[in-house]
Amino acid sequence: MSYAETTNPNAPVSMVSTWDKTFAESDKVDHRKVSFQNRYGITLVGDLYLPKNRGDRKLAAIAVSGPFGAVKEQSSGLYAQTLAENGFVTLAFDPSYTGESGGQPRNVAAPDINTEDFSAAVDFLGLQKEVDRNRIGILGICGWGGMALNAASMDTRVKAVATSVMYDMSRAMGHGVGDGKDRYSTSDRRAVLQYLNAQRWKDAENGTFAHGGHDIYVDENGKVTAAERILPETLPDNPNPVLKEFFDYYRMPRGFHARSVNSTGAWTATTPLSFMNMPLLSYAGEITIPTLIVTGEKAHSRYFAEDAFKAVGSKQKELVIVPGANHVDLYDNAAGKIPFGQFEQFFKTNLK
């Protein structure tokens, strides 16, 4: 759908009332479907989770989002519901342009707007009668880990920040995801920019936005290619182990959701442009609040977490490396490796 085809491009796409998550509904929490606006006027849709035994006291709250290209019915909802079982008011939300949230065209990401989405979630939580607005934290999973740290460096209302198997999406798109290090050379970056800006001409001429994979490859001859989808419809023979990790979650019943970009399609093809020139962690050194960065021992993304940990300025920071865990092990608890107890203790200690 193009921007011109809707009378209210910022309105929610839907607000499904039935339980349609990839995880079981807990009998220990109350659940509400909610909506709220960010400062760009885009209406975000979220799931609010509240402990059933909360009484009348005001509670600490946590906004949760991610992974990049996922929806609140997947990993972020599981984290939010589990933390709510342990006494927090939590909000898992769909970022702008994705899931049930508003914004046209669909399947767009941008570092500024997505950082703002976290602050808008703080706005919403701070207005709820069950919440003590002086005790709000945020948690970002995968690519939303970088967004969470960016928000924490700017939004002084956030009192604690945590990440799980984080990606720095500016670095990932701007320098390529390699084997524990950046993949692009300077000439590779220039070739990717040429490729993306050629796509802008095509989009302008066609009056529509093409979609394609955001992980763009440059071969030894300088040829640039990108997949049509984030994940293939079927897994190839002898797949890359990281591709198989993602496929086994997003494309299989374990984690598939029809509204998830990662499960069913791709971002707009030009989505990497703003990430390439707007580093998310430029001000990580100004983060002064308690910070917890969790990653997996075998996660291909581990280097993002370790480098972000070094960059964070807080004196109260902790890096947790989960033994034996790969990246997607911390999306759901299929392998029993998500350290929910450490997330719970971190927020209980620092949101009191």
Regions found by a protein language model. Name each.
Residues G69-Q81, P95, A305:
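The serine-hydrolase catalytic nucleophile loop
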Residues I287, I293-T295:
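Short beta-strand/loop motif that positions the catalytic acidic residue
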Residues N150-F247:
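Alpha/beta-hydrolase-fold enzymes
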Residues A325-G336:
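Catalytic histidine-centered segment of alpha/beta-hydrolase-like enzymes
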Residues V108-K129:
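Alpha/beta-hydrolase active-site loop
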Residues R57-P67:
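Short beta-strand element of the alpha/beta-hydrolase
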Residues T82-G102:
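Conserved alpha/beta-hydrolase
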Residues A11-R57:
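N-terminal cap/lid segment of alpha/beta-hydrolase-fold proteins
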